[in-house]
Amino acid sequence: MPNFAGTWKMRSSENFDELLKALGVNAMLRKVAVAAASKPHVEIRQDGDQFYIKTSTTVRTTEINFKVGEGFEEETVDGRKCRSLATWENENKIHCTQTLLEGDGPKTYWTRELANDELILTFGADDVVCTRIYVRE
C-alpha cells in the first residue's frame, strides 16, 4: 500500500488558470485564486484506505475525510458542493469523480498519485486538466 502521509509543498503547477476558466470563474476571481494557490501547503494522514487531506492557502483551507470506495461530500475547486467517490486507479493512484449536488457544470474529478517521491495531483473539468506536483517537506 502506498504511503501518501506527510506534509507536501508544491513544486510546479500547470493549467490552473485554464481549469478555473473552464469552471466559469471570472477573470478577477481567477487572478486572486491563482495568486493565493501559488504556494499551497498540503497535509495528508492515511490509515489504509482512510484519508484526511488538509490543503491550506493564504485565502482558503479545505479539509476532506474519506475512505476509498465510499461516497463522501466535498467541494469542487471553485467551491461548489459535490458528492465524490474515490477509487484506486492502480496501486499508487487514487481517482475521484465528483457529482454536483446542485446546478450544472463541467464533469469534474481529481487524482492523486505517488511517483518518484512526488505527489502528482490532477484536477479535471471536462477536457481541461491541471497538474500540480508536490514534494515532501
Curated annotation (Swiss-Prot):
Protein keywords: Cytoplasm, Retinol-binding, Transport, Vitamin A
SUPFAM superfamilies documented for this protein: Lipocalins
Gene3D superfamilies recorded = 2.40.128.20
Cellular compartment(s): Cytoplasm
Q: What is a biological process (GO) this protein takes part in?
A: fatty acid transport
Residue spans crossing the bilayer: none
Residues of the signal peptide: none
Q: Does the keyword Transferase apply?
A: no
- Write down the InterPro entries for this protein, in alphabetical order: Calycin, Fatty_acid-bd, ILBP, Lipocln_cytosolic_FA-bd_dom
Motif Nuclear localization signal location, chain numbering? 21-31
Q: Does the keyword Nucleus apply?
A: no
So what family is this one in? Belongs to the calycin superfamily. Fatty-acid binding protein (FABP) family.
**Known function:** Cytosolic CRABPs may regulate the access of retinoic acid to the nuclear retinoic acid receptors.
Q: What is this protein called?
A: Cellular retinoic acid-binding protein 1
